[in-house]
Amino acid sequence: MKFNRLYTLLAGAALTVAVAGGYVYYKWQQVETLTNKGPTRLFTVEKGAHAARLIAELGEGETSPWAVRLWLRGHPELVAIKSGTYEIKEGAPLKETLSLFASGKEFHFSLTFVEGSRFEDWLKQLSSAPYLERLTVEQSETELAQELGIDNGKLEGWFLPETYAYTTHASDISILRRAYQDMKAFLDASWEKRQANLPYKTPYEALIMASIIEKETGQPDERAQIASVFVNRLRLGMKLQTDPTVIYGVKDRYDGNIRRSDLTDVNPYNTYVIDGLPPTPIAMPGKASIEAALNPKSTDYLYFVAKGGGAHYFSRTLDEHNRAVREFILKKP
């Protein structure tokens, strides 16, 4: 009799344990199989956020707080999540999402700056970039140049036009610093491999020339030839007479047309008036234009004129150039 009673008690206890264990397993699996609710989107994990609260916020399905706590004890590697902005996928396992938060692999935004853009264009892009801290608005050009280590206080031309990735912890100045460092490194390396006897005294003068080449080039395969024209003119002491410098010099007065008064306007960038190079670059040159400035094609051309489609007709003499102007610009025989 006593044995039967003991057996009954033990059997009941075992059944209770089995049921309880099954229930715990069921609740564990509920958490284990949770998926992200909502569409694929960016999600910001705030500093100090707790994994259990994120499970409740993001999980698609029913859970119990105690089951979530138990599940997290079984997955301690998912507890130490890192703040930041992440891309979470629609329907992805929540376990995978928490693993992403724990890894700290934030979503990377990107900014692409095009060759030939000006510093003012960069500032506009930076000001409209999402999740980027704005610090440049508080600084003058001179102050910003000083912070970046640019000696002459002028920023035009000093940033390499490329695609730059960043996360939500980045600032606009951090993007500019990387672009400046990339430009300086490429310019210095290219300067060391330059042709002999070029009419530049410093890498900065080559950067100025590269910016002019960038603005004049419509067909990439003409860069080195365009560079040769300007190098030849510098060697002969001729004025560069290039329209993009005129446009840069007249600033906001430019409305799409270059007037005769613009060509005679006395300013440091009017290469129809000044000798040699302007004082600063007129845009951000790309790598190809820097290479062309430092390794121009060997020609005896002194002039070129646009002939359509971004291409140019190159001339050796003024008479030949004037004939080309009549043919391609004035449309006269």
Label the predicted regions:
Residues 273-282:
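Histidine-acidic residue clusters that define the catalytic metal-binding segment
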Residues 220-268, 273:
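Small-residue-rich helix-loop
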